[in-house]
Regions:
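Aromatic pocket-lining residues of Rossmann-like dinucleotide-binding sites
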Residues: 19
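NAD(P)-dependent Rossmann-like dehydrogenase/reductase catalytic/cofactor-binding core
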Residues: 22-24, 174-177, 181, 209-435, ...
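Amphipathic alpha-helical segments at domain termini/boundaries
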Residues: 64-83, 164-173, 179-181, 396-405
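Rossmann-fold NAD(P)-binding glycine/threonine-rich loop
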Residues: 97-146, 153-166, 338-391
């Protein structure tokens, strides 16, 4: 296939390398000829590196470069061009102008594809004389390594184009998912679940960025915490995406932005690229502060209180602490000196203190969510005795013989604690994507694991917990906070009620009105 790529920036050169390596003839062009030269040099250096590392032969590298053709004029006639991929700056007027000029230069048989990450594919296509020829083809940077591509048909896109683009993408070694033309498409939309909830937790002073990041990594198993991720991406970029998707979905509560970001963006606290963000960077930046040492009395007796519905979590915590040698009291209530540990699921320690008459100074929350690493989370209320909290942290840090001690994060009491809130938001946003038929459930999980690097897809993650337990969590968060961002989605509610998995697309009305044959 002969492919013309318009735009020789980071994304355009990555797409060019990917397509040429897969055996396609690629015309690479830009209104700035120096950008094309730099892009070809970059691709050459990447291919040379691949040869040095033994991932490609010298002959294949040379053949790939021969298939990469620098083009001086983006609007040159191209009777043999079969596909155009536009990768210019993210501006509607610029993109429509590019396609308008290409429409005059290329044959009517050429398929047009835009690499837009945030603009409406339908609006870009609407400026063409033939809007049926255009679709979205959204790659992720760096293209050769990020092996997922979103195929986005516009409202007028010919039905044969998305399957053809899918076949092309998958023949070149990447995976393709078909996504509805909605704000943020799939991956950027799904990614809002983590960062918006992390910002909400920071607003509430539940923990600082380092606390929340540690919990995200060590409990949820994410490669990076949300604040580390925002610093890597750039807060200016992240905040703009959050605002754009929220506005695009008409201020949906689940996608609500934080008041924290505008001032930080204005102050230039963008992250790694400016040297300061949620963390400091550079040779003169101070080293990250270590976690406070564990200093309490690990032998102080504890009583594990199982609130209604949490008997299983309470029993599991008792068993784990007993195996670690902790002094775990039994009976109907705690002794006068015992710490009270309360496993919370979408609720607060404060509610347990009020509802069950627990000693406010000695009662603490423990997140029962199974940890990916060796970290536990202790929640403290405003009434907590600091000495008792230090002792509770020491007890939770205990480990069975031969095991590493647990790290213990101390956070402010909030509904569901940190990890539950983050996971509930991740699952809820993904469920909303499936519910709106923006993408199929399997594609949601595929795109999120490939595009965001999550250890498991969000819907499959919810299934690991159980649809009924996820619904219980969403309902408890909504009931406890009153915040509509935690309102259970129809997708989770129905599947919990019907005994279906969150990954199950279910039966649609269309399935019931036509024969399978």
């Amino acid at each position: 296939m002969r492919i013309r790529i318009v735009g020789a920036g980071a994304m355009g050169r990555g797409i060019a390398q990917w397509a040429a390596t897969a055996g396609h003839t690629v015309e690479l062009c830009d209104v700035r000829t120096e950008a094309v030269t730099a892009a070809v040099d970059f691709v050459r250096s990447m291919l040379e590196r691949a040869v040095q590392k033994g991932r490609m032969s010298a002959e294949d590298s040379a053949a790939t470069l021969e298939r990469l053709i620098p083009l001086d004029d983006p609007w040159a006639q191209g009777p043999d061009v079969e596909l155009v991929v536009e990768a210019v700056r993210e501006d509607l007027d610029t993109k429509t102008e590019v396609f308008g000029r290409l429409e005059k230069a290329l044959p009517a048989t050429a398929v047009f594809a835009t690499n837009t990450s945030s603009l409406s594919v339908t609006r870009i296509a609407a400026a063409l004389e033939d809007p049926t020829r255009l679709a979205g083809l959204h790659f992720f940077n760096p293209v050769p390594l990020m092996k997922i591509v979103e195929i986005v048909p516009g409202a007028a896109t010919r039905p044969e184009i998305p399957p053809a683009l899918t076949a092309l993408v998958e023949s070149c070694g990447h995976r393709a998912v078909t996504v509805a033309d909605t704000p943020g498409f799939l991956v950027n939309h799904a990614g809002r679940g983590l960062v918006t909830e992390a910002l909400a937790l920071l607003e509430e002073k539940v923990g600082d960025p380092a606390d929340i990041d540690r919990i995200a990594r060590d409990v949820l198993g994410l490669r990076m915490g949300p604040f580390e991720l925002m610093d890597l991406t750039g807060l200016d970029v992240t905040a703009a995406v959050i605002d754009s998707i929220w506005q695009g979905f008409r201020h949906a509560d689940r996608l609500r932005p934080s008041y924290l970001t505008p001032n930080r963006v204005a102050a230039g606290l963008h992250g790694r690229k400016t040297g300061r963000g949620w963390y400091a960077y550079g040779p003169e930046a101070p080293a990250p502060a270590p976690e406070p040492p564990v200093t309490g009395d690990a032998d102080r007796p504890v009583f594990v209180h199982g609130t209604e519905g949490q008997a299983r979590d309470a029993a599991a915590l008792r068993t784990a602490l007993t195996a670690a040698g902790a002094v775990v009291e039994t009976g109907d209530g705690p002794s006068a000196d015992a710490l009270v540990l309360v496993p919370v699921w979408g609720t607060t320690v404060a509610a347990a203190v009020a509802g069950y008459g627990l000693p406010a100074g000695r009662a603490f929350g423990v997140d029962p969510l199974a940890a990916a690493g060796r970290r536990r989370v202790l929640a403290v209320t405003p009434a907590a005795d600091p000495a008792a909290a230090r002792d509770a942290r020491a007890v939770l840090a205990r480990a069975a013989q031969g095991e590493e001690p647990w790290a213990v994060s101390v956070v402010r009491d909030t509904a569901g604690s940190v990890a539950q809130r983050l996971l509930a938001s991740i699952v809820s946003v993904a469920a909303g994507i499936a519910e709106r038929s923006i993408a199929a459930p399997a594609d949601v999980d595929l795109a999120v694991t490939a595009g965001l690097g999550y250890p498991v897809g969000p819907l499959a993650w919810g299934d690991r917990i159980g649809a009924d337990r996820m619904l219980e969590l969403h309902r408890a968060l909504h009931r406890t906070t009153g915040d509509p961002r935690h309102r259970p989605s129809r997708w989770v509610t129905e599947r919990a009620q019907l005994g279906l998995a969150l990954t199950d697309p279910g039966t649609s009305p269309a399935d019931c009105t036509s024969d399978a044959s």
